[in-house]
A protein has these predicted regions:
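Conserved binding/catalytic microenvironments
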Residues: 1-149
Length: 149
């Protein structure tokens, strides 16, 4: 993630490839000592890297290929959905972004409500608000603290 945040696409992909090999050797998703790791978690990190690099289409493609129900942690499942929401937001598919945010909120409300990235995305969606998303979006905006009740 650090490499992606620095804009180092090659470095990020190199780290992901190495993690993918280790996950493949492990063979299954594990949660030993609260350290979730395995093929699914590496897939989630691939999507996260794509979010950081602004590759919206790849985020959505990678996120759709992941079965988050294989992860024992609700927070990791929610994080995956937040990546998907950001990808849809970057792609300006606001209805899909909102659906992913609401799904993440159902899984781990405290996690979603405290994330600055969620607040920024909700503000962005409010600027582009459509009639079809307005009631649900405004309710979410209130819950995450970017719109007064």
């Amino acid at each position: 993630m650090v490499a992606a945040r620095r804009g180092d696409r090659a470095g990020a992909n190199e780290f992901l490839a190495e993690a993918g090999l280790v996950a493949q050797r492990l063979g299954a998703d594990r949660n030993d000592f609260w350290t979730v790791f395995g093929p699914t978690n590496v897939g989630i990190h691939r999507a996260s890297v794509s979010v950081e690099l602004g590759d919206a289409g790849r985020v959505v493609e990678q996120a759709r290929a992941i079965d988050p129900s294989r992860l024992p942690s609700l927070e990791r499942r929610a994080h995956h959905l937040l990546d998907l929401a950001q990808g849809y937001g970057q792609w300006r598919k606001d209805h899909e972004a909102l659906d992913a945010l609401l799904h993440a909120e159902r899984l781990a409300p405290q996690e979603v409500h405290q994330q600055p990235v969620v607040q920024r995305l909700v503000v962005e969606l409010l600027y582009r608000e459509r009639r079809t998303t307005k009631p649900r979006l405004r309710e979410l905006a209130t819950r995450v603290g970017v719109l007064a009740a």
